Structures are given as C-alpha cells and as structure tokens.
A protein has these predicted regions:
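Phosphate-group recognition and catalysis centered on beta-loop-alpha active-site segments
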Residues: 3-294
Length: 294
C-alpha cells in the first residue's frame, strides 16, 4: 500500500519489516534480539519480549521446549535449573507443574511472580509487532506451524537450521503454509561448505543465510561473495566472538571499547542485513546514527 507521496504505508510493523527483507535494494539493517532484553528481565520472558518491541527491534529470537503433556514453552535449556527455581527436565514435567516455578533473572535471583511463558502467549504478544525467530525448535515444526496458523502469525515466524535442502522441502510439503526458513552455514566445516554449494548449484535463493565463522580468511570471504551474487541477504551473530570472526568482533567488544562503529561497522561493510545481538540498544543506536535503522 502507498500514500499519495509515494512512500509506502504499512498496516502493521511486521509488514514493514518483511518489506525491508524482501527488498533487494534496501540498506535497512534488521536487529535481532537474542532471548529478548535479558539484561533487564529474565531471558525468554514476556517482559523481555515487550521491552525489545518498545526499543524497535525487528526480530525476537526465542527458544522452545515441550513439556511432558506437549505444551510448547519458552526456554533455551533442556532443564529448569538455570532459568527457574525448579529442577529437572522440562520434558519430564507437566505444564501445570511447571507453573509452580518462577523465572530467575540473569544474575540468578528468583523473580516474585514471573512464570515461564508458553509459545502461544509469546506469539500473541508479538503478533503484527515483531518477527519471531523460533530457535531450538525444528523437531516441533509441525506443532509450531499448526499453532501459528491458528493464531494467524505463520508469515512472521522464522526458523533456521543446517538441515539438507531435501529434508526441509519434505517437511514443508506437509503444510499449505510454512514458516519462513533460513539455512545456517558453518563456513569452516565440510558440512557447511557442502550445504552452501547445494544452494548455489540448485540456484536456490533463500531470504537470507546465517553465517557462522571464528576466524577471517577465504572461507568467510567465499561465502559472502556467493551470497551477494545470488541476491540473498546475510545474517550475522555478534552474540559470541566464536560466531563472528573471533576475539574483538562481538557485542561485548563493541561495548567494552565504546566503539560500536569499529565492531558493527565491519559487518555493514561486509553487506550484512541482519544482526543478532545481546546488546540491542547499543546496536540500534549505532545503526540509527548512520541511517541504517528507523
């Protein structure tokens, strides 16, 4: 939809974000918040999600596990031990029992009232406001598609993985509508190189590739060149140095050096269009200062 001035008008913020992703000429850089605003709220909690929505983050990365009675809940770990005041495997406990435990803050102190949210609750908070990257969840693909269809959010939910193309195509063939999907390429591994080559040889162009590398050199340079030639976009993780070129290249380096341009600028120069971060406010401020985010 466009207004009389020629500027596009979108019904929802999600429509705008998707338009930027799908526009090959856009210089907008999407910000992905890893587990939400976990420095101020418990990771993967509703307040952590609401906080990054208020910041203007584009994608909320969250992790999913399934309870004993098949309820999808938000948690990175297989166990309750680190993120709640409970103990044991999430897969061994019912949802009702899970609700007797409270979430912990990042420093380990238990909150007064916050419980582990369900994926349903999180998606309703995110609907029309922010894209959702559901991580650690490919085994629940069918269940997640069913839920997103029920809630009307399938088109704003993203899943990533390093599975082969045929496996992904087969899994998606079971559904009329599918989640967005992005391949993850570990650029130094033989499996990663093989997967990248398969996309190139088949002439397939996913919305973006997530690249993971721990040192500079030909491996990452070759991947970047191939992706630019294909016309896809590049997703970079700055959450840990081991995922983005080694020491001195991650969020903490940007923060501790007080030099976000020196760290994040190299990924802009590389042509990255999506950056996952543990410091969303720092990254947003930098991108806005150079006109690459709104």
């Amino acid at each position: 939809m466009s207004c009389s001035s020629g500027e596009p008008v979108y019904k929802t913020r999600v429509e705008k974000i998707l338009a930027e992703i799908n526009n090959p000429h856009s210089d907008y850089v999407l910000v992905v918040s890893h587990r939400g605003d976990w420095r101020n709220y418990p990771e993967n909690s509703i307040p952590a999600i609401e906080s990054v929505i208020r910041m203007g983050v584009d994608v909320m990365e969250l992790d999913v596990k399934m309870t004993k009675d098949s309820v999808l809940v938000l948690c990175h770990d297989r166990t309750l031990d680190r993120t709640t005041n409970g103990r044991g495997l999430i897969s061994d406990i019912t949802y009702d029992s899970l609700m007797t435990f409270k979430l912990k803050r990042a420093h380990g102190v238990t909150t007064d009232t916050l419980r582990m949210p369900t994926l349903r609750e999180a998606l309703l908070v995110c609907k029309d406001k922010i894209l959702v990257n559901v991580d650690h969840a490919y085994d629940y693909y069918d269940e997640i598609v069913k839920l997103t269809e029920e809630l009307g959010v399938t088109g704003q939910v993203l899943m990533k993985g390093s599975h082969g193309i045929d496996r992904v195509n087969e899994d998606m063939s079971n559904h009329r509508n599918n989640l967005l999907y992005m391949p993850v390429i570990s650029v130094h591994s033989e499996a990663g190189k093989s997967l990248m080559a398969d996309y190139v040889n088949r002439g397939l162009m996913p919305m973006a590739f997530e690249l993971c590398w721990n040192r500079p050199g030909e491996d990452i340079e070759s991947c970047v060149a191939q992706i630019h030639e294909m016309g896809s976009k590049i997703w970079v993780n700055t959450i840990w140095a081991s995922l983005c070129g080694g020491l001195g290249n991650d969020d903490d380096a940007a923060y501790e050096s007080n030099d976000p341009a020196g760290v994040y600028g190299q990924y802009i120069d590389m042509g990255a269009s999506i950056i996952q971060t543990d410091r969303p406010e720092l990254l947003l401020n930098y991108l806005r200062s150079i006109g690459r985010h709104q």
